[in-house]
Amino acid sequence: WDPNKGPLPQPLIDDDVRFVSETLGLAADRLIPSLHLLSPTTATQRLGQGDLQAGDGFAAMRQQIADDDGLTLLECAGSLQEGLLYGLSLPQLAEGLDAGVLLVHLWQDSCSVDALLAAKQTLGNRLVGVVLNAVTPGEVESLERQVVPALENLGLPVFGVMPRSPLLRSVTVGELVRRLNARVICCEERQELLVETLSIGAMNVNSAMEFFRRRRNMAVVTGADRTDIQFAALEASTQCLILTGAGEPLPQLISRAEELDVPLLKVDHDTLATVEVIEQAFGHVRLHEAVKATYAFRLVEEHCRLDRLFSALNLPVHVA
C-alpha cells in the first residue's frame, strides 16, 4: 500500500477471502474484514505509535464471531511471530478468540519437524493438528507410513499429507505481465495461460532444445538477441516467451508466436532481475483461477482426513 495513492479501502477485504466467498456462495455480510495491512509503510507507522495492542477492531471482530453460531475460518500470518507488532500474532489470536489452530506446514524434510514442535510448545492444547503441505509426490507414501505415526506419537495429529502440485504453484501470464511491467507484443488475449515452470535460455541451442523437451508449461526468459533460443522455445511447451535486454524481436518470430498462440513479452529488466521477479510470483500462490480451485478441492478430498479434523473441532459434519 502506497499512502500517496490514497487511503486504504474500507472494509479491507482480502482478495483470497472474496474468492473463497464467491466459490462457496457466501453473502457479503459473512466476510470478516482484515484489521490491518502488513506492509513496510504500515509497520513504520505502527512503530512510531509504540502501541502493540490489537485495538478496538479486534474487540469488534471477536464480538462478531461470538454472535455467529456457525463455523468461522480465519487465515493467520505465515509464522508464529508475524503480527506481533499489531497484537495479532497467531498465538494472540488463538488466545483472544478461544480458537483452535490448524497448521498447514510447508514440508521440506524431517528437520522441519522442529517448527511443528515449537508451535506445539507455544500453542499448547489450542493446536488441533497439522497438515503437511507441498510434499514431493514420491515421498507421500513414505511420510504417511513412517513420519505421520511418529508425529502422532509426539502429540501432533496429522490430518493430511498434501503433495506438491506444479498447477497450484502456477501463475498466469497476465500476473507476470503485471509484475514485470512487461510490454505484450502479441497474443494479448492469452494472458490467462498458466505458467508452471521457469526456464532460462542462456545455453547453446542444442542444449536448450533438449532441456525444453523435458519441461512443460514454461515461461522462457532469454535475451532479445538470442533468436535461436527464441524459435526453439516456441516449438516446446511454452506458455510465454519473455525477452530481456536491448533490441526488438524479429518479425518472423512474432509471426510464429502468433501462429502458435504464445504470448511474447518484452521487459526492461535484465535476465537476472526478470528471473527474480518471476520466482517471487511463484512464491505467492493464488487459487483465483477456477481450474486451480477445482484441483485444490480434489487434492484435499484425496489426501486429507476431514472426518478426523471435524471430529477434533467438535463439528457435527458428515463427510461421505
Stretch-by-stretch model annotation:
Residues 156, 161-223, 280-320:
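Non-catalytic interface/targeting segments
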Residues 44-86, 91-96:
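Phosphate-binding/switch loop-helix module in NTP-utilizing enzymes
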Residues 1-2, 134-136, 163-168:
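Glycine-rich beta-alpha junction loops
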Residues 65-68, 209-218, 233-237:
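Flexible, charged surface loops at secondary-structure boundaries
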Residues 1-53, 64, 150:
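N-terminal phosphate/diphosphate-binding loop that engages ATP/GTP or pyrophosphate donors
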Residues 70-74, 101, 218-222:
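Generic beta-sheet signal
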Residues 21-29, 125-135, 184-194, 269-278, ...:
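Short, basic, helix/turn surface patches
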Residues 76-159, 225-288:
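Conserved catalytic-core segment of NTP-binding enzymes
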